[in-house]
């Protein structure tokens, strides 16, 4: 390959042109990830079998050819595509700092001064909020952060891991150790720490910490991308300057034409070949010009408002700080709910876990256990008469569920919970139990018996039946728990002062009771006697 050709002259014998051309082509296209601007000079020396300390003209000419081919190469083009991402990261970090630490930052700050302001703010926050040995250790990690392709040490106390830190360190490891390429597919949310990735702080301090950390992570992403974009050009210029100094004893000239003319003077008929290049000679200010395209504040690419939405509103990857519900107020000791309403909560819970009880329609409220037991005993004692039955109100279907025997002082409450339409019969003042019809037995016979004896039994007999039922329930706790699922019976004197036989408060942590009507305060802390106490009209 002798003769004058367009391109950069490479002063090596023609028999070495094949191996050297392949090496230089792999560097320009980026196919060989092991090649970089820092080690390409050594690779060239190995390819031409030149010992260290030998003539630098061959290596100098090869480096100059790569320098002229770099701006339009596929290797540099893939890095230029990351310039908008780097500008966005820097602009976002800058605007986040102006929002939370406006006194320590300004529009004229360099990325390095911005990093120092963020580190100072985080160090002060860790000391003021806790100051334990772990926090002090993280202060050293913050101080050790350096701009560039460096991993982030431990900087957040009282946390096991942080997703943005893992992402950035993995990216650095891929670029430095594995010599990989960067293909960014992320948005600002992945560089915003979640609320569980910071220490347990007050709400205002938590927002401040997450904002400063998000600014720090965006700034670190900028430093990584900046070095990745400009590293090859800077390393190649440094190698070119060193070999020019070794060959001539002078610093690198300002114009590339000086170096080209120097190399052309060594060209003979059999000691060179040309590497084709396009375009003019690459200026030696190329790294600085490339850096000027990266270190830019562009408000059109800023994602600071999006990061603030993630932090303050809990959208995207960020999750708002959890709010724990307050415990329900202590219930009144006066019975204000009917038995059917109290037991319906347990039956609703049972239906969710075990399905619909056999023989019970979803549209029919559960049968009151007092009614069933009292009615069956009344039939046995009185020979099956209907003295315990009230007349069915007109217009009411026989399928209407019975009213609880514990009559509420308000008639409207009885109609609401027991499903009775029309006018309701008030309990006489001499009786505290209002007996009603039971679903067991023939409904027509019960209606007829109710018409014959519409008046309820005496209060004395009703109280005796009720006390008998209470004794039966105390004898068999399992039946009580089955009939009143959702409530639990506690034993003797507990730590909270509740007595034997009392129902403790509903367990709010049980998922079965979440969403029940009444907010979990119904029946809490009441005994059997208080739940089914004899009412006085």
UniProtKB/Swiss-Prot annotation:
Keyword terms, alphabetized: Virion, Virion tegument
Acidic residues: bias regions: 492-517
Extent of Low complexity compositional bias: 420-441
Region annotation (Disordered) ranges: 322-466, 486-537
Family annotation (Pfam families): DUF832
Subcellular locations according to the entry: Virion tegument
Biased amino acid composition, Polar residues: 334-347
GO CC entries: viral tegument
Family: Belongs to the lymphocryptovirus BRRF2 family.
Name assigned to this protein: Tegument protein BRRF2
């Amino acid at each position: 390959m002798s003769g004058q050709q367009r391109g950069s002259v490479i002063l090596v014998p023609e028999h070495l042109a094949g191996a050297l051309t392949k090496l230089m082509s792999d560097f320009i296209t980026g196919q060989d990830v092991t090649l970089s601007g820092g080690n390409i000079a050594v690779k060239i020396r190995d390819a031409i079998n030149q010992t260290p300390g030998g003539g630098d003209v061959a290596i100098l000419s090869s480096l100059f050819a790569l320098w002229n081919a770099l701006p339009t190469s596929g290797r540099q083009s893939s890095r230029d595509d990351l310039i908008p991402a780097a500008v966005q990261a820097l602009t976002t970090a800058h605007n986040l700092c102006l929002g939370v630490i406006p006194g320590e930052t300004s529009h004229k700050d360099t990325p390095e001064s911005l990093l120092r302001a963020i580190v100072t703010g985080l160090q002060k926050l860790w000391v003021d909020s806790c100051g334990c040995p772990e926090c002090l250790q993280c202060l050293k990690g913050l101080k050790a952060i350096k701009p560039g392709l460096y991993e982030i040490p431990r900087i957040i106390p009282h946390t096991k891991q942080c997703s943005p830190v893992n992402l950035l360190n993995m990216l650095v490891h891929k670029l430095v150790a594995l010599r990989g390429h960067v293909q960014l597919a992320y948005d600002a949310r992945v560089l915003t720490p979640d609320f569980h990735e910071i220490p347990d702080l007050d709400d205002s301090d938590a927002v401040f910490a997450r904002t400063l950390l998000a600014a720090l992570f965006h700034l670190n992403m900028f430093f990584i991308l900046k070095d990745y974009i400009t590293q090859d050009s800077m390393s190649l210029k440094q190698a070119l300057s060193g070999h020019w100094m070794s060959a001539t004893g002078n610093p690198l000239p300002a114009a590339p034409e000086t170096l080209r003319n120097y190399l052309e003077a060594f060209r003979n008929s059999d000691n060179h070949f040309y590497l084709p290049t396009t375009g003019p000679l690459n200026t030696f200010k190329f790294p600085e010009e490339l850096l000027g395209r990266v270190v830019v504040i562009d408000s059109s690419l800023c994602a600071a408002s999006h990061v603030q939405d993630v932090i303050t509103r809990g959208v995207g990857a960020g999750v708002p700080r959890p709010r724990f519900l307050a415990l329900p107020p202590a219930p009144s000791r006066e019975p204000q709910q009917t038995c059917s309403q109290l037991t319906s909560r347990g039956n609703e819970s049972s239906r969710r876990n075990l399905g619909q009880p056999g023989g019970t329609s979803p549209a029919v409220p559960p049968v009151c256990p007092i009614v069933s037991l009292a009615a069956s005993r009344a039939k046995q004692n009185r020979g099956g008469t209907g003295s315990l039955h009230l007349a069915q109100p007109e217009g009411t279907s026989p399928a209407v569920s019975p009213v609880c025997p514990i009559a509420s002082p308000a008639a409207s409450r009885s109609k609401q919970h027991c499903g009775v339409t029309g006018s309701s019969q008030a309990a006489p003042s001499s009786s505290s139990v209002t007996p009603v019809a039971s679903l067991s037995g023939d409904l027509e016979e019960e209606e007829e018996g109710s018409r014959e004896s519409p008046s309820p039994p005496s209060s004395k007999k009703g109280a005796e039946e009720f006390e008998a039922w209470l004794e039966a329930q105390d004898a068999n706790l399992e039946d009580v728990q089955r009939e009143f699922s959702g409530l639990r019976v506690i034993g003797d004197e507990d730590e909270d002062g509740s007595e034997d036989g009392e129902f403790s408060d509903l367990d709010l942590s049980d998922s079965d009771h979440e969403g029940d009507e009444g907010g979990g305060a119904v029946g809490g802390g009441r005994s059997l006697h208080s739940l089914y106490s004899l009412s006085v009209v």
